[in-house]
Amino acid sequence: MAWLQSRTWKRVFFTLFMTGMVWQLAACDNNKEPEQRKAFIQFLQTRILPSEKLSVPTLTAQEKESFGKYADDYAILSDYSSEMTTAFSGNDQAMRQMRSVTSAKDMVEKRDTIEKSRKEVGNIESKRADTMKSVEDRYSKLKQPDDLKAVFDQAYQKTVVRPNALLTQTLALTDAILGQALDIGNYLNSLGNKVQYVGSMAQFTDQKQLDLFNEKLSAMREKQQELLAVARQLAGMQ
């Protein structure tokens, strides 16, 4: 019986000891919080906010340790940055496929390529929307001290909100251009032998058909100019 009591007290003592250790560790971590917060704020102010780049750097092991729990807050920015880079790369690939479409005849003969590229862009947009929803949810649940929140909010606007707006615009314009190219290809195909192809141009015998073709082509070129303007903005942030 004494042996059982001894074992019981040992278990109780061990439990109390471990509980005390946990509280000590928690207290120690809490004592580091001001220092960790200060380090994180300084990092955001010196490495993120002044940078012209859209992407954000990956934290080193030392930085993660110095930021403590705030390394998880930074993950919101870095996770989105990683997804954004992948999305832009995917959109560029879709547009590269379109570079093989260099003539009116190509828009007829390569409609499958155009349609495939458009579906890829649609998939990228769907993933972008899901990613942004997840990021916004994580961001809304943050509980940060006021001094950190003021700086982090600026970093969030710069590295998430603004890039997301540019990516959304890029994908929408790309989809519109691909849709217009597909529409032109279908239109030319519907005319059959009423249209002749000479080099990169299409020749019509009916003025109304030519006018409609030019109208469609002009609308597509306007969208291409809009996409080029967005691309220039992005080029300055690479």
Give names to the regions the model predicted:
Residues 28-111:
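Leu/Val/Ala/Ile-rich N-terminal alpha-helices, chiefly Sec-type signal peptides and the beginnings
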Residues 45, 71, 78, 85, ...:
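Residue-level detector of alpha-helical secondary structure
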Residues 17-21, 44-47, 208, 217:
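Prokaryotic Sec-type signal peptides and long signal-anchor helices
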Residues 59, 63-66, 70-73, 96, ...:
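Amphipathic alpha-helical coiled-coil segments and their boundaries
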Residues 17, 28, 56, 60-71, ...:
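Short, structured coil/loop segments at alpha-helix boundaries
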Residues 1-26:
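Sec-dependent bacterial lipoprotein signal peptides
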Residues 108-203:
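Extended amphipathic alpha-helical interaction segments
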